[in-house]
C-alpha cells in the first residue's frame, strides 16, 4: 500500500512538468505547421523579381548594369554564387560577403559613391531596400546548391577566426554574446526556437534559411540585417553595414553551414 501511495505521489508531482513539456512540444508543432502553410505563397518572390530588374537595369553615373559583377564564380555568374560566399576577392584584396561585394560592384562598375550604394541597406516597412531586393534575387539562384565556403586563402582563415572571436565575445550592459543564446540546445525566446550554432545541424539549418521574408515586418531580411538586429538586441554598438566585423561573423556562420543545401529565401514569423 505504501508503495502504491508513493508511486501516486510521484506521478502527481511529475504531472505539471509532463503537461508543460507536452504543451511545449505542441506549440513547436503548431509553429512549424504555420510556417509550412506560408511557404507556398512566399512574398519573397516579389523581392526576387525586383532584384532581377535592379541587376539588369543600367544605373549610376556610368549608366551600366550589374551583369558584369563578379560574385566569385566569374563575371555575371550568379547561379550558385551565394553558396561560396563570403570569400577572398583579389581585386579588392579582402574577404567579402554578398552585400559588400555588391557595394564594390556598384562603386566600380556603376560609378556610385559608397554613400549612394549603402543609402538604404534595410527596408523600413514604408521604403523598400534595393540591396535587400538584389540579395533576394541572387540568393534564390543558389537554392538547392550545397554550401561550400572556402578557407584556402589566409585572409579567409583570418576572417573565420575573427568571426569566431566575435561570436563568443561578451559585452554590453547585459554581458551577452552571440553564444549566450546560440551555444546550447533547447533554448527559446517566446515562440522562437534558438538554434545551437556550435552544432553542425543547427548551424546548417539556421544559415541556409536566410535571407527570409518576415511576416511580422512585411519585409525581406538579409543575413546582414539578422546580425545587425542581434547586436541591437544585445545592446551592443550598432553593427556597421558590410563592416569587417559583419563579414567575419558571416564567414564564421557560413563556413559552419558547409555541406548543407541552401534553402532560402525562406519565410519566418
Positions of the model-derived regions?
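Hydrophobic, well-structured mid-protein blocks that either form specific transmembrane helices
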Residues: 134-141, 150-151
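Short, charged low-complexity linear segments at domain edges
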Residues: 36-52, 144-164
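Bacterial N-terminal signal peptides
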Residues: 6-16
Amino acid at each position: 500500500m505504501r508503495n502504491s501511495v508513493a508511486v501516486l505521489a510521484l506521478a502527481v508531482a511529475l504531472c505539471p512538468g509532463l503537461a508543460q513539456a507536452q504543451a511545449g512540444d505542441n506549440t513547436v508543432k503548431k509553429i512549424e505547421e504555420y510556417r509550412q502553410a506560408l511557404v507556398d505563397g512566399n512574398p519573397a518572390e516579389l523581392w526576387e523579381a525586383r532584384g532581377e530588374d535592379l541587376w539588369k537595369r543600367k544605373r549610376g553615373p556610368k549608366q551600366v548594369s550589374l551583369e558584369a559583377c563578379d560574385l566569385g564564380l566569374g563575371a555575371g555568374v550568379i547561379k550558385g554564387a551565394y553558396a561560396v560566399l563570403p570569400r577572398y576577392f583579389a581585386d579588392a584584396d579582402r574577404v567579402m560577403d554578398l552585400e559588400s561585394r555588391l557595394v564594390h560592384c556598384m562603386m566600380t562598375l556603376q560609378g556610385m559613391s559608397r554613400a549612394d550604394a549603402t543609402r538604404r541597406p534595410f527596408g523600413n516597412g514604408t521604403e523598400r531596400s534595393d540591396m535587400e531586393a538584389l540579395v533576394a534575387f541572387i540568393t534564390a539562384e543558389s537554392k538547392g546548391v550545397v554550401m561550400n565556403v572556402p578557407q584556402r586563402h589566409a585572409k579567409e582563415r583570418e576572417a573565420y577566426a575573427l568571426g569566431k572571436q566575435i561570436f563568443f565575445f561578451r559585452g554590453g550592459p547585459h554581458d551577452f554574446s552571440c553564444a549566450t543564446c546560440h551555444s546550447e540546445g533547447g533554448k527559446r525566446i517566446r515562440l522562437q526556437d534558438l538554434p545551437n550554432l556550435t552544432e553542425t545541424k543547427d548551424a546548417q539549418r539556421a544559415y541556409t534559411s536566410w535571407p527570409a521574408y518576415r511576416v511580422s515586418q512585411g519585409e525581406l531580411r538579409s543575413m546582414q540585417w539578422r546580425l545587425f538586429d542581434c547586436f541591437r538586441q544585445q545592446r551592443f554598438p550598432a553593427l556597421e553595414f558590410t563592416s569587417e566585423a559583419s563579414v567575419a561573423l558571416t564567414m564564421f556562420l557560413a563556413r559552419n553551414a558547409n555541406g548543407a543545401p541552401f534553402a532560402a529565401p525562406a519565410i519566418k514569423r
